[in-house]
Amino acid sequence: MVYNFYEIILLVVLIVSLILKIPISLFNKTFVLGTLVLLFTIDFNTLSLLEWQGIIKVLCWIFGIWTINLGNSSTLSSTDVLIFCVIIASSIMVSTNNLLALYLCLELQSLSIFIIIARKRNSLAKIEASLKYFILSSISTGLYLLGASVIFVNLGVCDYTVIINEDYSMGKLLIMIALLFKLGASPLHFWIPDVYQGSDNKALLVLATLPKLSVFGVLVLLFPNNKLILVCTLLSLITGSVGAINQSHLNRLLAYSGILATGFILFGLNSEVFWGIEGSLIYLVLYTATFLIIVVGSNSGLNNNSLIIEFCNMLTQPKIIMIVLTLSVLSIAGIPPLGGFLAKWVVISSMISTGFVLSSILSIICAMIGGAYYLRLVKIIYFQQDKHFLLWKKILVPNKKPVNNTIMLGLTSYFVIFILVFPQALSQIIYWATISSF
């Protein structure tokens, strides 16, 4: 197990936040200052910052900090402390090669997310969603412990590096099923739509970003069973594309969109070649960034758990928010020349080059179906007439735009658009990270 400055800094901030009320502005300034100090004082060649574990940690850190800044709170709240726990668990997950340490990280991650979802106790929907997540997550954790026990009984060690080359080990199979559950891959996806619908925006961002990044980082290091991952990939593509067609709630649409994205992420992992894994990580980063833009951008004109038809209210918002939201939706739909198309093209081309032609054709069909309901959002934003039953929300619900949300939306949008102009800024970093995973 290798710890470095990531975990140390997060642990120090976590301890301080438990004792003092840290202002968000001071926290952001400290984060920026610490980042600049690390950039100018650390020897990147000796530290191997561009290794696979380092890149996953940096991504978890960045998206975690963005999630903490969501909202209009002036100080770090108890929810933000729980998000810190999720960030620390995600970082240690990709640092360790011990099965018990990995189990503790999964539990810390699950329990923190469970409390984040259920923190508003006066909402029955949130309580229901948190209980579903907790119970089903406990079942997957039990499968993980059973797999770890089988490995320990047979091999006498708790190091998962000894099972990397074992394709049909029962212990490895159970561990893979537990990790795929955390990732939300079909047929282990049944909890995602209900949990997403019962989550508010901050819980939704935590649930849809940090676990996916950390679990994907572990899956690449495990080199999983190709046939098991392929079955889950194809089922995820079909379920995510077909299941979202008739959805009326935004959160449920995002849930099936996440399942479809999981299918493409696992699709590159099936190839077991360099450019396939590189394409999967590029797709994961761009999907996470665009997911953040959609959630934060829709929050500017809509409420939590809104209907999709309410996107017609976005015409009353500033034009820049509409443009950014539209570009993000088109990107995640895979419309060229946006970043989402680039990521899907890299993943599908890597699969075709390794002989998965029929699976690639199926993925293209599923991407076309998925693009249809993304384009439906664009149609509602620009061409849908306003409905009379939505007028009461305009009158009774104030339209608040916290400054932090606007800053996050601008920075994330700049990143997604900048990738179109200079894709090497992301691909070169992921290139070196992927090399280190082989």
Label the predicted regions.
Residues 1-438:
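Alpha-helical transmembrane segments of multi-pass membrane proteins predominantly involved
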